[in-house]
């Protein structure tokens, strides 16, 4: 009996350890990225999370890079795992979604290719900045996107938002939700119903722990579309002085430190359409001008002939 009493503390300790392990497993999630697989296999049972698709260890105290998020999104599509409802709208220029190649730090590699061996060069946001080519295409560097313009259009309201209040609320949002340093939000412009948010960040300005404006813009875009990447959070819920801000449309423009390298081939279709429209307009203008001149000329001839006939019919004095 005494031996059983001696074992009781050990059993209680064992049960406590099992309960603690189970609790750690339950609480082991990545609050800033739901597209991860987490476990407590780290040193001392520390919770560790790896991005789906790449298995890269992510830092859950800050935002995950856009490249790793896109790779996880494409991997989820392939495996039919329902993590985040994918949007049907293209988010990378006009090329739609693609399965990106990321470096060991989770950043986009300079050259991206698809399954058909078509390749192109991208900027630090993953947006194509050259014509598409084959696997012989060379991309020497990842050109940094240093200026992002987010353009929003909100639903009609009884009255326009106060610009100062709107500015303060959006700055608070990017600082608290997206961990973006306030100095990187350059300006907030507002002309009802259009809101423009300017993010600026040079490579020399970004510190080691600073959130990249590309990642902040991508998280914001997913929030706007109701596809939040944060665990336990729904879409964006922004209120300005108690008035909800409902966004109808979002456009994001990217400005790189170096201009893009598109050739005239990319503009061929558009140029042909423009030239055709201009040509039709010119031909129509010439036709109208000729017809108008002929009508005027015909009237003048009739008047001259009529006057000449009257002169001939007059009796001579």
Curated annotation (Swiss-Prot):
Gene name as annotated: Tacstd2
Organism in which the protein naturally occurs: Rattus norvegicus
Family, as annotated: Belongs to the EPCAM family.
Cytoplasmic topological domain residue ranges: 292-317
Topology versus the membrane: Single-pass type I membrane protein
Function comment: May function as a growth factor receptor.
Entry protein name: Tumor-associated calcium signal transducer 2
GO (cellular component) term, any one: basal plasma membrane
Thyroglobulin type-1 domain mapped to chain residues: 64-139
InterPro entries to which the protein is assigned, alphabetical: EPCAM-Trop-2_C (IPR049420), EPCAM/Trop-2 (IPR043406), EpCAM_N (IPR041630), Thyroglobulin_1 (IPR000716), Thyroglobulin_1_sf (IPR036857)
Disulphide linkage map: 67-102, 113-119, 121-139
